[in-house]
């Protein structure tokens, strides 16, 4: 078995673009078309359309794989396209994948530096799309593939950079969950214990109790050495939110 960044991945993906292969342009499938294709399966057609962007190849490959993660054929195609791009552009893709489904322009610039040209090249290369005041991957599966291909060290480093950049560009109450996520992925215990409980309280105040429970649970994963009284506060918060969302078995 070969790794996600093995050179053979490029070869496998390039086979689909060989001059000896007849290429046909297919427009994205509509949500209705995806629903028809997914009929009789356990797939949520709306979620499938969101993840694939309606890309016919992605849709059919995901359905054929039966929900067993991202199909290798999709991974090969995405990684082959990324491998052909300059290293500066690949760095942009790595950062955008870690930032999430949507990467604000100023945040992305903070993480990768003032590489405006590299961001534009990522768009020209068909990997990113301009969206509002930032960028998004053309397909969520492409973002997840790039994210999965990162080494553990690279991923942690980028999450730390994103966390630092979020603090630098300024955040508000609605960013607490995002900060908590990147703090956890960066392994920053102090930041998790600062942001996750605050994110839980914010979610609870908005009636998002399941999200609140998840944030308390996130904090508790880093609370082993916390002062007993502070840990009790987290446990009580989690218990209350779990009760309201019928998750007491957890």
Name each model feature, range by range:
Residues 249-250:
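Alpha-helical repeat scaffolds
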Residues 25-226, 237:
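Short secondary-structure boundary elements
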Residues 1-25:
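Sensor-1/coupling segment of RecA-like P-loop NTPase cores
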Residues 230-236:
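Amphipathic alpha-helical repeat scaffolds of TPR domains
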Residues 17-20, 121, 228:
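Short, structurally constrained coil/turn elements
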């Amino acid at each position: 078995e070969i790794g996600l960044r093995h050179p053979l991945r490029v070869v496998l993906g390039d086979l689909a673009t060989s001059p000896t292969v007849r290429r046909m342009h297919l427009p994205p499938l509509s949500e209705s078309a995806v629903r028809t294709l997914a009929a009789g399966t356990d797939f949520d057609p709306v979620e499938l359309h969101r993840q694939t962007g309606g890309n016919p190849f992605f849709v059919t490959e995901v359905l054929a794989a039966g929900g067993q993660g991202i199909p290798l054929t999709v991974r090969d195609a995405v990684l082959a396209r990324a491998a052909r791009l300059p290293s500066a552009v690949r760095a942009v893709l790595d950062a955008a994948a870690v930032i999430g489904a949507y990467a604000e322009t100023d945040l992305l610039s903070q993480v990768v530096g003032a590489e405006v040209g590299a961001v534009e090249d990522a768009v020209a290369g068909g990997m990113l799309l301009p969206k509002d005041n930032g960028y998004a991957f053309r397909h969520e599966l492409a973002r997840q593939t790039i994210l999965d291909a990162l080494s553990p060290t690279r991923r942690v480093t980028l999450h730390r950079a994103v966390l630092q950049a979020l603090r630098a560009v300024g955040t508000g109450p609605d960013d607490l969950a995002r900060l908590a996520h990147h703090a956890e992925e960066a392994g920053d215990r102090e930041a998790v214990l600062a942001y996750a409980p605050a994110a839980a309280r914010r979610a609870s105040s908005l009636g998002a109790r399941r999200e609140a429970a998840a944030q308390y649970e996130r904090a508790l994963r880093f609370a082993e050495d916390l002062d007993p009284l502070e840990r009790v506060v987290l446990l009580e918060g989690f218990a209350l939110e779990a009760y309201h969302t019928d998750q007491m078995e957890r």
